[in-house]
């Protein structure tokens, strides 16, 4: 039984209880998360970068997303799972875009997430919500628009940009999103948006006043020692711990310490 549902997001904001979300891409990681207190899981299109080594999220496809959603849903059947709509999958004709939504939902997602709030997206979100499918919005740094934005940069620093973000947030809430991600926006702006809309905000690089926080599992575990954006706290030095385990294995194999005849052999 899934421990969380869409009304819980609204209730938690109303009760001033923070929402914890972790981005996860695979079965074994999901198994661990399933035993944790983390509220929900995002299967993000960032898997194109984290799992496949691309420099952007753009190479993620609907089929790749569906495969990873299936793996995560098998590992964490008790968690609320959000699936990212990948690059251009919701910018096509309505039938094709809805086929993409259907694929992700049938793969095991309980909701979808998409980036931006232009007229096309708002119309599509309205249709998806009216179809009975929960939607999370995403504003601020929207990685699928990385070439338009000019890189991975903080958004909403200028007054005009901040005003637009506020308007977009209100539009997403009014269109029917049940929550939204705010990525890499100034803390004060994120706080204003959070207090100005009825739905919860999930921050990443958006300060402490959002309704919750999301981090990529590999980032919070510190498995990439080359990645240290300002917003990231590494809750474990995973890189060094994993490297040490590998070096210890290598050493024991080469010294014939492992496998031990009495302990590890049949």
UniProtKB/Swiss-Prot annotation:
Q: Which coarse location class describes where this protein primarily resides? A: cytoplasm
The source's superkingdom equals: Bacteria
Q: Does the keyword Magnesium apply?
A: yes
The broad enzyme category this protein falls into is: transferase
Q: Coiled-coil annotation: which residues?
A: none
Tell me what reaction this enzyme catalyses: 3-methyl-2-oxobutanoate + (6R)-5,10-methylene-5,6,7,8-tetrahydrofolate + H2O = 2-dehydropantoate + (6S)-5,6,7,8-tetrahydrofolate
What do the Gene Ontology cellular component annotations say? cytoplasm
Q: Which GO terms describe its molecular function?
A: 3-methyl-2-oxobutanoate hydroxymethyltransferase activity; magnesium ion binding
Q: How is the cofactor bound?
A: Binds 1 Mg(2+) ion per subunit.
Query: Which GO BP terms apply?
Result: pantothenate biosynthetic process
Q: Which InterPro entries match?
A: Pantoate_hydroxy_MeTrfase, Pyrv/PenolPyrv_kinase-like_dom, Pyrv_kinase-like_dom_sf
Q: A Pfam family in this protein?
A: Pantoate_transf
Active site annotated at which positions? 183 (proton acceptor)
Print the keywords alphabetically: Cytoplasm, Magnesium, Metal-binding, Pantothenate biosynthesis, Transferase
Q: Which residues bind 3-methyl-2-oxobutanoate?
A: 45-46, 84, 113
Q: Which cofactor does it need?
A: Mg(2+)
Q: In which pathway does it act?
A: Cofactor biosynthesis; (R)-pantothenate biosynthesis; (R)-pantoate from 3-methyl-2-oxobutanoate: step 1/2
Signal peptide as annotated in the record: none
EC number assigned by the record:
2.1.2.11
> Subcellular localization, per the record?
Cytoplasm
Q: How does it assemble?
A: Homodecamer; pentamer of dimers.
Tell me which family the UniProt entry assigns to this protein. Belongs to the PanB family.
The protein's job, in short, is: Catalyzes the reversible reaction in which hydroxymethyl group from 5,10-methylenetetrahydrofolate is transferred onto alpha-ketoisovalerate to form ketopantoate.
According to UniProt, the name of this protein is: 3-methyl-2-oxobutanoate hydroxymethyltransferase
| Gene that this sequence comes from | panB
């Amino acid at each position: 039984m899934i421990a969380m549902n869409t009304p819980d997001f609204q209730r938690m904001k109303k009760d001033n209880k923070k929402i914890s979300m972790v981005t996860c891409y695979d079965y074994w990681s999901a198994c661990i998360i399933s035993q944790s207190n983390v509220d929900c899981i995002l299967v993000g299109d960032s898997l194109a970068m984290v799992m496949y080594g691309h420099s952007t999220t753009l190479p993620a496809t609907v089929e790749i997303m569906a495969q990873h959603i299936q793996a995560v849903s098998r590992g964490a059947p008790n968690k609320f799972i959000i699936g990212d709509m990948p690059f251009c999958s919701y910018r096509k004709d309505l039938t094709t875009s809805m086929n993409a939504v259907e694929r992700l939902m049938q793969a095991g997602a309980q909701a979808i997430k998409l980036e931006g709030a232009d007229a096309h997206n708002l119309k599509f979100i309205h249709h998806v919500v009216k179809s009975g499918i929960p939607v999370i919005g995403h504003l601020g740094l929207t990685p699928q628009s990385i070439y338009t934005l000019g890189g991975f940069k903080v958004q909403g620093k200028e007054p005009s940009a901040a005003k637009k973000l506020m308007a977009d947030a209100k539009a997403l809430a009014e269109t029917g999103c049940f929550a939204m991600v705010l990525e890499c926006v100034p803390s004060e702006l994120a706080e204003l948006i959070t207090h100005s809309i009825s739905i919860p905000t999930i921050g990443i690089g958006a300060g402490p006043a959002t309704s919750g926080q999301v981090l990529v599992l590999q980032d919070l575990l510190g498995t990439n020692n080359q990645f240290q954006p300002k917003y990231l706290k590494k809750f474990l030095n995973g890189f060094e711990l994993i490297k040490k385990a590998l070096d210890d294995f290598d050493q024991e194999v080469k010294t014939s310490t492992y496998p031990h005849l009495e302990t590890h052999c049949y």
